[in-house]
Amino acid sequence: MKPQLIDIGTSTKKSIQIKVVEQKYLMAPFHFHDMCELVYIQKSYGKRIVGDHVGNFKEGDLVLMGPNLPHIWLNDNSFRHPRSKKMVQAVVVYFSPDLLINLSDDESVTAIVGALIVRSQRGLWIYGKARDIIIGKMDTLANGKGLKKLIAFLGILDVLSDSNEFQYLASIGFKNSYSEKDTNRLNEVYQYLNKNFTQKVSLQEVSKIANMSSSAFCRFFK
């Protein structure tokens, strides 16, 4: 299955959408959309794929993803067990790049916001003091009203634009250029990793799942 293009909705493209997630496990497919997405994991763990990055995520993680960046968050299989009492809690903020660009006519502001959008196209894992400040403001976004929400959102943008407390996730120059054949392979590998989350998985195993040699598989993920 190739990454799906998801339409977040026209009304959202002119505003900010806040989604509070409380469910048994994460269910969104490998997908992308034309919005920026800020994800705060309050309670959950597993593996995430952002572009060509594959890594673990845990409680407290904060990630900014730019427009058209394929991504998926996969919970440990134990979350899906019928008797599991585990729950996912997260806050997700969607906002349009156009909304950011149109915030001000000041060229210096536009340049700063533009630079943030460019950085976000590789996915940013945010840590340190920047993370703590943003998480506090996301609480206001989720629970506040009116002008307080707008002020909190602008505060988040200010921190994201000014801070160096982040790590890139996807590699330099990554572009969403998956072919259907490539994405079928990726999906097979992702599903296998999800089912065998607690096991040590060898390169030979995942290469076989992708129907590739080990060396070809390594080149494929470069």
Language model features with spans:
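Short, solvent-exposed loop/helix junctions and linker helices
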Residues: 32, 150, 179-183
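A hydrophobic/aromatic-rich effector-binding and dimerization subdomain
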Residues: 2-11, 67-136
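Generic protein-terminus/edge-of-domain signal
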Residues: 1-64, 69-72, 76
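An amphipathic alpha-helical interaction segment
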Residues: 106-177
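Short, flexible helix-adjacent loops and helix caps
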Residues: 78, 146, 197-198
